């Protein structure tokens, strides 16, 4: 607590009057005027003041001159102003958190003073009257919760007479529903009766100075040190967005900010200020719960531009203050906010005005006639492709909330495809309808999908190996120049086509740009030159391109082929690309980000990202704040546990096919309401991911067939494109010589690719490839992963059960090979996902003789890695929702009154839906706010969690960066 009222026994003459004033921080001048009017109305409505006993005017003057100020060390920005006079005790809370306000309200109710006044004035929602605080909100529901506290009830019952409590609060919304309270004389919003006085005017002026909106540089402080953070592994930062939500999704080469939260002091700022660029901003819905945090960032960007044009100050200090990430494309639908603050401005109108001043044209999100055609946000050969699927709104309803699905397909065959859902306020029925249109996609039909799994059918349909592969690659690629105008891609980063050219690019000397000098501070790990993302730049590989957003499915279908870099030929070179186009010239055209040549991932994770995934000690129930943070306190679906503890079941990292050296406890949050057991420390926490893969890699085995000797492992190989580009490239195709037949040499082993040991397989499995796995095509080579391998002892046990048990396993588990001795120590459990069917699965993928998946029935489940639950009163979530939307990690966000009222039903629906899953998958639940409903549900259903494999994390996780911690939960995939 920032300030605690003294107990009545500690003073000789306790005050007969208590005054508690709560003022929320104002983000705009118009909002400040409304708050001051509410404060004056509340003080003048206190009819219990007897002028013969207490002179309110003199007591307020004494408060202004003699009060003591306390700054909270727990809640940064919260202040408490306290003064105790002869007859009046006054406490003013400025910019408090929800917990601080509830604690002070509890102290006010338990105080024996006979007359009390509570003034609640601050930014509040027009719909419900809920006050927006620094963290969370305060509504009539929270007021009744404090009144129902056992200690408060005992104090009211023991009082000789029922104390009088006057409450001045919003006159609209749910506050009008408050009724009589036993043991308390409650008066709600009485009319103003006291006259205006000089002391009241001085009191209001002093409070107004404390509530003035801070400057953008004070609200969003610059980092203490220079340098930029590089996020090399796919991850998602879950921020406590207050009444809304805020998230930050990142892959190697592209970052996406989703919403901004309700707090003007952006919860995501302490992370993004360490980045050189935010490539995309996605606003699922416009309102007071999602845009204030984003608008604060836009105001800072505009203030930076004005400061740069102003008088020159100290050069170093000026550069440090102007340090902020560049902004890429912004997706925003609504032109008016769905929810507003009383007395405040429309956040959606404000956001569009700020974007217009910055020269950024927001782009709408709308589902096309064929929702399976995504918008490619980012694609780079050798790295991967990030796709955006719009599930909602349908065509013709641009103002509706947006629902977006991000799918990351890495280039490495053994890496996991990451699927993250951001529904915003989309109604669950429409969300399920949008997912049903995508349920045929292979990446959504299994709990675990890798790039190798997605490419297997295309390789199975090819019989001509080299000849057909080369002809399919070279001829259509030359038509990509003519199809540039048909792209729907936000950002493209080509790579050179041959390995020799790649080596020359890495080893040759390059001249760093001016922006690279900012990467020399602490935390800068990637020291290779990169092209600046803000302002003029010197292109290294190619010039930036512009392309309009796809308006029809025909344009979206050409995304893939047009974005792949062409093969080197005399008629096509990167220097011949069209010139760049300014991003704000036309709202119908989408500006591609300038090219940033990213270096290939290094062998050691520590050399590519400063974040380390380390175990964290679980905190006790109700601990006040974190006592242990790391460079990146995270949640990782990746566990390697000792074999001697069969009773401990932790969620595993289902996605990676390569065994990871990191041992991470999923309970990596502090404070953590729900304590868990902590696994033993990792054997080699400093070892790299790639080195661990190479150590666990089986010995090289000669290919047993022609198809196995031709894996698509080279990032430099051109990729086949569709026939739609043949016409555009016919002229250049005639000038190129025909490809020379060649037999490629055997390629070195790559993580995620291994050969099957024939001796370790059951007798029935020692058959030709076309009969080993009946669910795959006969021509598909068996490429099981090395990450999910099991010890030989597990293979022997499988032999005794017979091959029937293998047929009952899902495809993702059936493709796991038997392990070789020495790959995984026998004293440790392998990182194998628990995907054993509980019953005969009707949702398992099946393939016909042609290798094509069988059509799915309506209502088939969709598997995701992380999914936010629809919030903001979007609709009721029943067990059918969790039966259809199966995610390894669910996020509950939005600490609003409507959210808490239906929270218990949502949590019970999760248990009921998870109980009907046919696959035994580990599920993690991440709430972004603390709730008594969540605590009570956890205590009552904890036994079911263990049986169903559900892990509930605490809501107080912290991430440390440059010796400063901020609330967030990092989920690594």
From Swiss-Prot:
Stretches for region Necessary for interaction with RASSF1: 601-973
Q: Which Pfam families match?
A: MAPB1_N, MBL_MAP1B
Top-rank taxon, per record = Eukaryota
Q: Where is the stretch described as Disordered?
A: 452-538, 560-853
Q: Where is this region: Necessary for association with microtubules?
A: 645-880
Low complexity composition bias: residue spans: 603-621, 703-722, 782-801
According to the UniProt entry, which residue ranges have a biased composition of type Polar residues? 459-468
Family (UniProt): Belongs to the MAP1 family.
Write out the function statement from the record.
Answer: Microtubule-associated protein that mediates aggregation of mitochondria resulting in cell death and genomic destruction (MAGD). Plays a role in anchoring the microtubule organizing center to the centrosomes. Binds to DNA. Plays a role in apoptosis. Involved in the formation of microtubule bundles.
Q: What is this protein called?
A: Microtubule-associated protein 1S
Protein's organism: Mus musculus (Mouse)
Taxonomic classification, please?
Answer: Eukaryota, Metazoa, Chordata, Craniata, Vertebrata
């Amino acid at each position: 607590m920032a300030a605690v009222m003294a107990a009545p026994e500690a003073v000789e003459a306790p005050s007969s009057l208590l005054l508690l004033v709560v003022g929320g921080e104002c983000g705009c001048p118009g909002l400040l005027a409304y708050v001051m009017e509410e404060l004056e109305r509340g003080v003048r409505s206190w009819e219990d003041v007897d002028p013969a006993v207490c002179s309110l005017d003199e007591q307020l003057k004494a408060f202004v001159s003699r009060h003591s100020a306390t700054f909270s060390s727990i809640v940064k920005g919260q202040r408490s102003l306290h003064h105790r006079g002869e007859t009046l005790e006054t406490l003013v809370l400025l910019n408090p958190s929800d917990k601080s306000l509830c604690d002070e309200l509890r102290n006010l109710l338990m105080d024996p003073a006979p007359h009390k006044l509570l003034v609640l004035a601050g930014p509040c929602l027009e719909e419900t009257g809920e006050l927006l605080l620094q963290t969370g909100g305060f509504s009539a529901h929270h007021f009744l919760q404090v009144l129902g506290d056992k200690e408060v009830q005992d104090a009211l019952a023991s009082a000789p007479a029922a104390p009088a409590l006057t409450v001045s609060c919003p006159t609209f919304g749910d506050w009008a529903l408050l009724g009589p309270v036993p043991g308390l004389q409650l008066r709600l919003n009485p009319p103003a009766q006291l006259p205006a006085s000089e002391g009241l005017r001085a009191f209001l002026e002093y409070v107004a100075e404390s509530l003035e909106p801070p400057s953008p540089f004070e609200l969003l402080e610059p980092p203490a040190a220079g340098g930029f953070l590089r996020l090399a592994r796919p991850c998602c930062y879950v921020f406590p967005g207050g009444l809304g939500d805020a998230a930050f999704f990142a892959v190697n080469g592209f970052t996406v900010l989703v919403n901004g939260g309700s707090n003007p002091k952006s919860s995501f700022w302490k992370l993004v200020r360490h980045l050189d660029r935010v490539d995309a901003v996605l606003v699922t819905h416009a309102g007071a719960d999602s845009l204030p945090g984003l608008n604060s960032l836009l105001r800072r960007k505009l203030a930076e531009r004005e400061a740069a044009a102003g008088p020159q100050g100290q050069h170093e200090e000026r550069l440090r203050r102007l340090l902020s990430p560049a902004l890429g494309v912004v997706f925003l639908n609504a032109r008016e906010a769905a929810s507003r603050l009383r007395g405040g401005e429309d956040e959606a109108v404000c956001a569009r005005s700020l974007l217009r001043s910055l020269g950024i044209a927001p782009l709408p999100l709308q589902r096309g006639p064929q929702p399976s055609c995504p918008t490619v946000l980012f694609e780079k050969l050798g790295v991967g492709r990030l796709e955006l699927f719009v599930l909602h709104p349908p065509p013709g309803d641009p103002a509706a909330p947006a629902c977006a699905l991000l799918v990351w397909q890495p280039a490495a065959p053994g890496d996991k495809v990451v699927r993250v859902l951001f529904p915003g306020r989309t109604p669950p029925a429409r969300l399920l309808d949008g997912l049903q249109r995508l349920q045929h996609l292979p990446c959504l039909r299994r709990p675990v999908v890798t790039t190798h799994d997605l490419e297997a059918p295309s390789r199975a349909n090819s019989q001509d190996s080299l000849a057909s592969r080369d002809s399919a690659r070279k001829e259509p690629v030359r038509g990509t120049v003519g199809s540039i105008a048909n792209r729907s891609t936000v950002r493209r980063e080509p790579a050179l086509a041959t390995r020799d050219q790649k080596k020359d690019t890495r080893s040759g000397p390059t001249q760093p740009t001016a922006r690279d000098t900012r990467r020399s501070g602490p935390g800068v790990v990637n020291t290779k030159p990169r092209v600046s993302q803000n302002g003029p730049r010197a292109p290294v590989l190619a010039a930036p391109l512009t392309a309009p957003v796809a308006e029809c499915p025909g344009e979206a279908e050409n995304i893939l082929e047009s974005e792949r870099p062409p093969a080197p030929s005399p008629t096509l070179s990167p220097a011949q690309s069209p010139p760049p186009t300014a991003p704000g010239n036309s709202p119908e055209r989408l500006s591609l980000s300038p090219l940033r040549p990213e270096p290939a991932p290094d062998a050691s994770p520590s050399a590519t990202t400063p974040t380390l995934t380390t175990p964290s000690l679980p905190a006790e129930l109700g601990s006040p704040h974190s006592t242990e943070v790391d460079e990146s306190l995270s949640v990782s679906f990746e566990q390697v546990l000792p074999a001697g503890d069969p009773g401990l079941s932790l969620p595993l990292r289902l996605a990676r096919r390569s065994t990871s050296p990191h041992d991470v406890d999923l309970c990596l949050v502090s404070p953590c309401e729900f304590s868990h057991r902590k696994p033993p420390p990792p054997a080699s926490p400093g070892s790299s991911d790639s080195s661990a893969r190479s150590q666990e890699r089986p010995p090289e085995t000669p290919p047993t067939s022609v198809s196995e000797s031709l894996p698509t492992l080279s990032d430099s190989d051109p990729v086949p494109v569709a026939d739609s580009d043949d016409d555009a490239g016919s002229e250049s195709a005639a000038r190129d010589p025909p490809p020379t037949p060649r037999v490629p040499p055997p390629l070195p082993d790559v993580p995620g690719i291994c050969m099957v040991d024939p001796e370790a397989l059951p007798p029935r499995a020692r058959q030709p490839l076309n009969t080993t796995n009946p669910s795959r095509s006969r021509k598909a080579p068996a490429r099981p992963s090395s990450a999910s391998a099991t010890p030989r002892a597990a293979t022997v046990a499988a032999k005794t059960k017979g091959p029937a048990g293998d047929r009952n396993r899902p495809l993702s588990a059936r493709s796991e090979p038997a392990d070789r001795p020495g790959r995984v120590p026998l004293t440790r459990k392998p990182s194998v996902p628990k995907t054993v069917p509980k019953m005969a699965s009707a949702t398992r993928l099946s393939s016909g003789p042609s290798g094509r998946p069988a059509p799915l029935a309506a209502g088939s489940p969709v598997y995701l890695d992380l999914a936010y639950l629809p919030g903001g009163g979007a609709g009721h979530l029943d067990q059918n929702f969790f039966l259809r939307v199966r995610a390894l990690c669910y996020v509950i966000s939005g600490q609003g009154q409507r959210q808490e009222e239906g929270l218990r039903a949502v949590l019970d629906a999760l248990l009921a839906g998870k109980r009907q899953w046919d696959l035994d998958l580990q599920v993690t639940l991440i709430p972004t706010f603390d709730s008594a409903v969540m605590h009570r549900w956890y205590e009552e259903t904890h036994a079911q969690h263990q049986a169903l494999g559900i892990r509930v994390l605490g809501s107080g996780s912290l991430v440390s960066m440059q010796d400063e911690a901020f609330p967030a939960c990092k989920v690594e995939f």
